[in-house]
Regions:
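C-terminal helical subdomain
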Residues: 154-155, 172-213
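Conserved NAD(P)H cofactor-binding loop of Rossmann-fold oxidoreductase domains
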Residues: 63-69
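N-terminal Rossmann NAD(P)H-binding glycine-rich loop of SDR-like oxidoreductase domains
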Residues: 13, 21
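Active-site helix of classical SDR
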Residues: 95, 130
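Alpha-helical segment proximal to the catalytic Tyr-Lys
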Residues: 100, 139, 143-147
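Substrate-binding pocket helix/loop in short-chain dehydrogenase/reductase
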Residues: 71-72, 79-84
């Protein structure tokens, strides 16, 4: 199709990212996959630059993320670096690499942050720092890019039923009104892209709050 658009979505293999990819593909997008580890910045830059020689990017969705909720002194230095690299550094670098292409297409950047970027919770200092950093990056970047026609949106989902919780000490309750599902976030992405004007920041929450300890 002549009006096919091109998107790059990180974290595409599971959870919210996988739902976003499936939904984009039903809405006239071809999703280009990155195979490089996001914390390997040298290889990542090489792969992105290779893709940009073939495609003009219409949409970048920074969705990949890791979580840890534990007393800060118990977190290893390597885990601190890994969370910062995946949750914050990689989206900033990918945006930097793709911005000229996005300006050309007057495209859109969507950052999947977290409800934790909007509040302060115990045992969440590291995770919240990375996600609030991503949120502020997006909000500032929108102001920078307004004249270019590039939209920037941050989505802050609350508890979403995905494998994100596999290695954590808690998970969403089994009650359906206490968690979101990935498809809700994916539909929100489409709504954002179809909105006249720019939704710069949106928080999505279930009606009730309840978690289950493992």
């Amino acid at each position: 199709m002549s009006n096919l658009k091109y998107a790059i979505v990180t974290g595409y293999s599971s959870g919210i990212g996988k739902a976003i990819v499936s939904t984009l593909e039903l809405n006239n997008f071809q999703v280009l996959t990155l195979t490089t580890r996001l914390n390997d910045t040298v290889a990542l830059e090489k792969e992105v630059k290779s893709l940009l020689k073939e495609y003009d990017i219409d949409l970048l969705v920074n969705c990949a993320g890791l979580g840890i909720f534990t007393p800060h002194e118990e977190i290893s230095i390597s885990k601190i670096k890994e969370l910062i690299d995946i949750n914050l550094t990689a989206p900033i670098i990918l945006t930097n690499l793709m911005l000229r292409s996005l300006k050309k297409t007057k495209g859109h950047i969507i950052n999947i942050s977290s409800i934790e970027a909007t509040k302060h919770s115990k045992f969440s200092a590291l995770y919240s720092a990375t996600k609030s950093g991503l949120r502020d990056f997006g909000l500032c970047l929108f102001e920078e890019l307004r004249k270019s026609g590039v939209g920037v949106t941050t989505i802050n989902p609350d508890l979403t039923k995905t494998n994100f919780f596999d290695d954590l000490q808690f998970e969403p309750s089994t009650k359906e009104d206490t968690y979101l599902v990935p498809q809700t976030i994916a539909y929100t992405v489409i709504d954002i892209l179809n909105t006249k004007g720019v939704i710069t920041d949106i928080t999505i929450r279930p009606q009730k709050f309840e978690i289950k300890r493992k």
